[in-house]
Regions:
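Short acidic loop-to-helix transition motifs that present clustered carboxylates
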Residues: 1, 145-150, 170-171, 195-196, ...
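Gly/Ser/Thr-rich phosphate-binding loop
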Residues: 49, 160-165, 174-230
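Short beta-strand->loop structural element characteristic of the AMP-binding/adenylate-forming
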Residues: 1-9, 32-36, 85-87, 115, ...
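Conserved structural elements of the adenylate-forming
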Residues: 51-58, 67, 86-106, 116, ...
């Protein structure tokens, strides 16, 4: 209501994992529910050609985007009161992406970013979704961060090199994974909460992973500062 939303885009798999069927049924009385599975089925040949040729000929398919216009409305986690809707422009998000790129050395031909964090939070959206697209990095999305064993196995099978996480989640993944499951990771970018010394020691000793800890806020798109690796 605060963002004047009229449509909700989701996926049946996400609804199933979260046992959100009753909520979706209630919301469907006020909003149009769009399932990504249905969108995929309705893609025309023209849509598929545009999607395939777009990366090769970007200037032919690029839509003009006013950078000052609203790009996204994200709601804060509510740690200091009721959640607030934060309006971010395209320029806000893209500027923060470039700032992060200037701080983290990325290798498009080698790096694989693993993002289990939700994109309805700014960290998961800016760093976990927009950044790898702009940087040309292969990205693996996982529908929920609450599956430590499955995530550890999937990191191994995809040979991911960068993990997005929080202190709580990366310590769970390190403990839940078998020896060697996280060995492909060279870096974990952590935010949302302070990284404890014991977490750094755990992942460094068990998996030889360096943690890049960031500080930020949704209003800042979200990264404000980050430590240097090493």
């Amino acid at each position: 209501q605060a963002a004047k939303v009229t449509e909700i885009v989701t996926a049946r798999k996400f609804v199933e994992l979260g046992s959100l069927e009753p909520l979706i049924e209630e919301l469907s009385e006020r909003f149009e529910i769009i399932y990504l599975e249905d969108v995929r089925e309705k893609l025309s040949l023209k849509d598929k050609l545009a999607g395939g040729l777009g990366p090769v000929f970007p200037f032919l398919f690029k839509a003009a985007t006013p950078y000052k216009k609203t790009g996204v409305v994200l709601f804060t986690s509510g740690t200091e009161g009721d959640p607030k809707g934060v309006v971010l422009s395209h320029e806000n998000v893209m500027a923060n992406v470039e700032q992060v790129r200037a701080h983290i050395e990325l290798f498009p031909d080698k790096d694989v970013l693993f993002n289990p964090l939700p994109t309805f939070h700014c960290f998961g959206l800016t760093v976990g979704a927009v950044l790898p697209i702009v940087a040309g990095i292969k990205t693996i999305f996982h529908p929920t961060p609450l599956q430590p064993k499955e995530i550890a196995k999937r990191i191994k099978s995809t040979q991911s090199t960068i993990l997005l996480a929080t202190d709580t989640f990366i310590s769970q993944y390190a403990r839940a994974g078998d020896q060697g499951d996280l060995n492909s990771l060279r870096l974990s970018v952590c935010g949302a909460e302070r990284v404890r010394d014991e977490t750094r020691q755990l992942v460094r000793k068990k998996n030889n992973i360096e943690i890049l800890e960031g500080y930020g806020a949704t209003e800042a798109s979200p990264v404000v500062a980050a430590n240097a690796v090493g």
